[in-house]
Amino acid sequence: MAKLTKETFVESLKEMSIKEVMELVEAMKEEFGVDPAAAVAVAAAPGEAAEAAKTSVKVVLKADNGKKVQIIKAVKDLLGGSLMDAKKIVDNLPAVVKENIKPEEAEPIRAALVEAGAEVSVE
């Protein structure tokens, strides 16, 4: 019996009807004792783990959209620094406003900056 290549197998699958593919899956379950749904769940797990591992983020000020004064005031209020410190941040875009913070902490900061007229991202 000739060895079946992946390419040949895929081409054969393309020619099958949905019913035939379902029957093939059932036959594979019986023959190998494998549940394809379990394999899909295992394959999806690494991506979910990466999302769960994202415990710290940074808030990045991307653009001032012509609202520089309002944004400088918002940055000053958020960081508790001086107007000059806030101005330095806003003058050098893109700029990290806060980093190594929890995603829950980043959302109010992002919202305040957006309300002031800024373009902001949480990374």
Swiss-Prot record:
Coiled coil: none annotated. Belongs to the bacterial ribosomal protein bL12 family. The gene is rplL. Disulfide bonds: none annotated. Gene3D superfamilies: 3.30.1390.10, Single helix bin. NCBIfam families: L12 (TIGR00855). GO terms for molecular function: mRNA binding; structural constituent of ribosome. Forms part of the ribosomal stalk which helps the ribosome interact with GTP-bound translation factors. Is thus essential for accurate translation. The keyword Mitochondrion does not apply. GO terms for cellular component: cytosolic large ribosomal subunit. Homodimer. Part of the ribosomal stalk of the 50S ribosomal subunit. Forms a multimeric L10(L12)X complex, where L10 forms an elongated spine to which 2 to 4 L12 dimers bind in a sequential fashion. Binds GTP-bound translation factors. Keywords: Ribonucleoprotein, Ribosomal protein. This is Large ribosomal subunit protein bL12. It comes from the Bacteria. One of its GO terms (biological process) is translation. Pfam families: Ribosomal_L12, Ribosomal_L12_N.
